[in-house]
Amino acid sequence: MAATAASAATAAPTGPAAPTGPAAPAASLVVLVDTGTEMPMAAFRDNQLVDGVHHDLGLALAARLGRQAVFLGLPRKRIALALEQGKADLICMYIPGWLPGNFHWSQPFFPMREVVVTDTTVPRPATLADLKGQTIATVLGYYHPDLVRVLGAGFVREDGPSNYSNLRKMVAGRLHHVVTQQSTLDYHQKTGERLSVYPPLLVKTYLGQCAVSPRGQVSVEAVNKAIVQIVKEGEVGQISARYQ
């Protein structure tokens, strides 16, 4: 009898599944971006990040983390405090020397090249040392320890608000040497008023990292796993190539 009852129970028809309702929205990944950043790194429209390396990289990392990217644009001076307070989860394309604070740093992964570019209206410098005593356009608030090491007191800065403002001054003939990222120079040559310049002098090559908030929603270990995935899948190279 027990077996018969069990068979009957097994054969009993099941009712329709209970409705599950809409899927819960994905958790967010709040990505900080400096509002002073320009293309190819970032483009803002109506205070919203809409394009650039920061945009594409944030989307790629969020996807690997199973989260929805939310971009928070802030002025450079407010970046560190917002990250320390957990108002954002991370900021990428930085290195520790640029962002002092109690942050967890990801593994280095995004290739970057700092260069000095010189226009062709002046003699071509053969080495960085040839720039000693000559004015070099820089961006206000950015530090260049490698140039300081080579030039010492001969590192003469002229600070501007952005890389693009400095390159526009070069177009206008107002200055002759600019320190910038190779990617910025390449993008300007592709999309802006083309500069007549010598091949740039390399200052430094390095790999950009992500600073992860100690009070954020994601751990640096999880971010590193996501980075390993996008590097292995070639997405870092694809993002970089998109803006060359």
Label every model-predicted segment.
Residues 8, 68, 143-161, 193-196, ...:
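Ligand-binding clefts/hinges and TM-proximal coupling segments of bilobed small-molecule sensing domains
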Residues 21-99, 138, 159, 223:
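Extracytoplasmic small-molecule ligand-binding "clamshell" domains
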Residues 35-37, 112-115, 190-228:
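Periplasmic-binding protein-like
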Residues 47-60, 120-159, 168, 183:
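Bilobed "Venus flytrap"/periplasmic-binding protein-like clamshell domains
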Residues 52-64, 122, 129-135, 142, ...:
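Extended ligand-binding regions for polar small-molecule ligands
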Residues 58, 79-82, 166-169, 175, ...:
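Short, hydrophobic alpha-helical packing/hinge segments within bilobed ligand-binding/sensory domains
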Residues 59, 68-131, 140-144, 199-203:
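Acidic, polar ligand-binding/catalytic clefts
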Residues 68-75, 155-169, 200:
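Short beta-strand-to-loop elements that line the ligand-binding cleft
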